[in-house]
Amino acid sequence: MEKIIFATGNEHKMIEIRAILSDLGAEILSQKEAGIKADVVEDGATFEENAMIKATEIAKIANQMPEYKNAVVLADDSGLEIDYLNKEPGIYSARYMGEDTSYRIKNANLIERLNGVPDEKRTARFVC
């Protein structure tokens, strides 16, 4: 059975990935489930660069492990871009206001920053 390692520690993301890839008939593992303990520095300038950095680093480690030598390694990076805020938080979405800050507090801060901004200028997107 083909093995696919997804370069993430995010359990919610793994639920989504397994649902999307369920028809492949492959064993789908998070990097944690594969026993890969790496804290990859996402220092790219774009979502795509960060995904490539993660996939490359995790693949290097997996390639050293006999059970994952031929595994496929996938990664993504995603985040919220708010046009009025010059596409903030963007690639920093996960780290916006600190990684330990709850989404509720982060969202409240973003809404506060948009206070007084007309609805038609409150455009945003989730980039993945």
Which residues does each PLM region occupy?
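Anionic-ligand binding patches
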Residues: 2-5, 11-128
